[in-house]
UniProtKB/Swiss-Prot annotation:
Molecular-function annotations in GO: carbohydrate binding; D-mannose binding; heat shock protein binding; metal ion binding
Chain sites annotated for binding a carbohydrate: 96, 131, 164-166, 190, 260-262
Protein name: Vesicular integral-membrane protein VIP36
Keyword field contains Disulfide bond: yes
CDD domains for the chain: lectin_VIP36_VIPL (cd06901)
First and last residue of the signal peptide: 1-44
Cofactor: Ca(2+)
Gene Ontology CC: one annotated term: plasma membrane
Source organism of this protein record: Homo sapiens
Membrane topology of the entry: Single-pass type I membrane protein; Single-pass membrane protein
Organism placement in taxonomy: Eukaryota, Metazoa, Chordata, Craniata, Vertebrata
SUPFAM superfamilies with a match to the protein in the record: Concanavalin A-like lectins/glucanases
Ranges of the Lumenal topological domain: 45-322
Gene, per the UniProt record: LMAN2
Length: 356
């Protein structure tokens, strides 16, 4: 894992232990804690290395139990999934494989943070590999389907780690991470790489890395944040940050992967869930969180992502038709100013002629 140290970015921290020659007590799990003071005066929601908030009933951690069998405590396998002593392989580097792993226990935490240690690798060259991994927090589990090995029209949250661009017209650079929230009414469109239903996303070069790769998902008080550590720097990098997300409690965590004509090894090394200690208002506490319908309060439609290669419609750069409209407005403004200037100039000329 990456070197030990505190990395503060967007209120996040991760302590990774165990490399020789570094300070620290040795290997240990990454876990969250809220610090009220940082350097004497900074207040923030920050995770640290204290394991008291790790929820083991929702976590997949080495050493795995049940190696060599078709099941393990707290987790169910499906499809091509294979358990080894070092990783859970969702699919091998073979065509037409689907596999998934799902937690037994529904999660009733209102605020949580999931750290995923994963690896996607294979022999395929550029754009000759696929398809990717999906991380799930959904109502239904162990239902195979066409969306990275799991069902379409799901209820809940999905984070897609997509390695292959099916849409040949896309401007985006793959691998690409995107987020989708669904109440069962939306279908994931593989031909467009899910762009029509994507809330936000980012390019993330996680395939065939020679070091560990991590992804973190935080959900707290309606804010969904996804961050990555892919550069072996022990540093979280912001990928997705969305507010107005509503997710119920009582759903299941899982991971799935699928291959088609192209393939890769899709491995999960660990999934660690942490409880975030967050105060809620009396009104929030009185809500039956199991009855909440998955939804997002949009500033704009996710379809606005179509011409935005970053996928982040809230803060992405101006591209495509947005640039065209901006230039058109500027041109019209110049024309109007020129016409008004010409009229004013002509009237001044006529007024000057009256004095001669």
């Amino acid at each position: 894992m990456a070197a030990e140290g505190w990395i503060w970015r967007w209120g996040w921290g991760r302590r990774c232990l165990g490399r020789p020659g570094l300070l620290g007590p040795g290997p240990g799990p990454t876990t969250p804690l809220f610090l009220l003071l940082l350097l004497g005066s900074v207040t923030a929601d920050i995770t640290d290395g204290n394991s008291e908030h790790l929820k083991r009933e929702h976590s997949l951690i080495k050493p795995y139990q049940g190696v060599g069998s078709s099941s393990m405590p707290l987790w169910d396998f499906q499809g091509s999934t294979m358990l080894t002593s070092q990783y859970v392989r969702l699919t091998p580097d073979e065509r037409s494989k689907e596999g998934s792993i799902w937690n037994h226990q529904p999660c009733f935490l209102k605020d949580w943070e999931m750290h995923v240690h994963f690896k996607v690798h294979g022999t395929g060259k550029k754009n000759l590999h696929g398809d990717g991994i999906a991380l799930w927090y959904t109502r239904d589990r162990l239902v195979p389907g066409p969306v990275f090995g799991s069902k379409d029209n799901f209820h809940g949250l999905a984070i897609f780690l997509d390695t292959y661009p099916n849409d040949e017209t896309t401007e985006r650079v793959f691998p690409y991470i995107s987020v989708m929230v669904n109440n069962g009414s939306l279908s994931y469109d593989h031909s467009k790489d899910g762009r029509w239903t994507e809330l936000a996303g980012c390019t993330a070069d996680f395939r065939n890395r020679d070091h560990d790769t991590f992804l973190a998902v935080r959900y707290s008080r309606g804010r969904l944040t996804v961050m990555t550590d892919l550069e072996d720097k022990n540093e979280w990098k912001n990928c997705i940050d969305i507010t107005g997300v509503r997710l119920p409690t009582g759903y299941y965590f899982g991971a799935s992967a699928g291959t088609g004509d192209l393939s890769d090894n899709h491995d999960i090394i660990s999934m660690k869930l942490f409880q975030l200690m967050v105060e809620h208002t009396p009104d929030e506490e009185s809500i039956d969180w199991t009855k909440i319908e998955p939804s997002v309060n949009f500033l704009k439609s996710p379809k606005d992502n179509v011409d935005d290669p970053t996928g982040n419609f809230r803060s992405g750069p101006l591209t495509g038709w947005r640039v065209f409209l901006l230039l058109l407005c500027a041109l019209l403004g110049i024309v109007v100013c020129a016409v008004v200037g010409a009229v004013v100039f002509q009237k001044r000329q006529e007024r000057n002629k009256r004095f001669y």
